Design a protein with these regions (language model features):
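Proline-centered turn/helix-capping motifs that create local helix->coil transitions or kinks
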Residues: 2, 59-63, 232-235
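Hydrophobic alpha-helical transmembrane segments of membrane transport/permease proteins
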Residues: 8-13, 52-88, 243-251
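Short, membrane-interfacial amphipathic segments enriched in basic
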Residues: 11-29, 79-92, 129, 207-208
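Transmembrane alpha-helical segments of polytopic membrane transport and secretion proteins
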Residues: 1-44, 289-302
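Residue-level signature of catalytic and energy-coupling elements of molecular machines
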Residues: 33, 51, 143
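Membrane-interface helix starts
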Residues: 30, 34-47, 105-109, 266-273
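Short, strongly hydrophobic transmembrane alpha-helices
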Residues: 38-57, 120, 280
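Alpha-helical transmembrane segments of integral membrane proteins
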Residues: 88-302
């Protein structure tokens, strides 16, 4: 009897160890994301780039506005401390690439935040309310989407001048449009679910249903699209700056540095290679992370 009792206790302990704990959606997504080597490696590289643009100007012996008149358009040199070289005005390129990276990343992340907040609320309300309200809201979206964006930017620059705030306004105006469409499509399928109908029967207000029930259930799609939107907005800001419609002196961004480097590419190729390298690597990292999040959060792959 003693032996059988010990055996039963051993079996119970062993079965408890073998018991598989249930995982939530986000725990399962994190596990799947960590198994994606390209996404994890991209996340690490992106973290290092963010660390570089934050810390490098603080550790450098040169400031953003310092000019070395004796080393104008100088090639990268370890002895002088100009590790990325200097531009035509003798300013340290490493510091300028780091400061420009701050602005480019800030624009991309800010555009993604605008898309997440405005696009999610607009799309979820449109999809949930349905009927004529949905039709009107979608027609308004189509009008905004068909508006020539470059013409809009030129008008802003003409009337208000060039500054970084206009870049945020201009890019924020278009970043949320596709997000609203995606969230609306998800909401149309969600509002027929039993838990939404139960909330309606229980007298829960429309605002509470949207914020407490619909928005949390579309966050997976929102996170994936936001991660893929950041590189698009960084590239768009770089394009505007390259055309001279974006950030201007004394501020700079990777796009503005590319524009300066392209003008002197034959005699000073480092002015183009360093900002272009950081821009390309950052865009690839965001895209790999977005692909990893999409694979991790896609319910079809479960």
């Amino acid at each position: 009897m003693m032996l059988s009792k010990k055996n039963s206790e051993t079996l119970e302990n062993f079965s408890e160890k073998l018991e598989v704990e249930g995982r939530s959606l986000w725990q399962d997504a994190r596990r799947r994301f960590m198994h994606n080597r390209a996404a994890v490696a991209s996340f690490i590289v992106l973290f290092l780039i963010a660390l570089f643009v934050t810390v490098a100007p603080m550790l450098s012996q040169f400031t953003y506005f310092d000019t070395d008149w004796g080393m104008m358009s100088s090639a990268p040199d370890m002895a002088s401390g100009h590790y990325f070289g200097t531009d035509s005005s003798g300013r340290d390129l490493l510091v300028r690439v780091a400061i420009g990276g701050r602005i480019s990343l800030m624009v991309g992340i800010a555009a993604a935040l605008v898309a997440v907040i405005v696009g999610t609320l607009y799309g979820s309300l449109s999809g949930y309310l349905g009927g004529k309200i949905d039709s009107v809201m979608m027609r308004l979206l189509e009008i905004l989407n068909s508006f020539p964006f470059m013409f809009f930017v030129i008008l802003l620059v003409t009337f208000f001048g060039q500054n970084i705030l206009l870049i945020f306004v201009a890019i924020g105006m278009v970043s949320w449009l596709d997000m609203a469409r995606i969230v609306r499509g998800q909401t149309l399928s969600l509002k027929r679910k039993e838990f939404i109908e139960a909330a309606q029967v229980g007298g829960v207000s429309t605002a509470s249903i949207v914020i407490r029930h619909i928005v949390p259930n579309v966050l997976g799609v929102v996170v994936v699209y936001a991660s893929l939107l950041v590189p698009s907005m960084i590239l768009f800001e770089s394009f505007l700056s390259f055309l001279g419609l974006g950030t201007q002196e004394p501020l700079s961004s990777w796009g503005a540095l590319l524009s300066d480097g392209a003008n002197s590419m034959e005699v000073s190729p480092w002015l183009l290679l360093f900002p272009a390298g950081f821009l390309v690597v950052t865009l690839f990292c965001f895209n790999f992370i977005g692909d990893g999040l999409r694979d991790a959060l896609d319910p079809k792959d479960r």
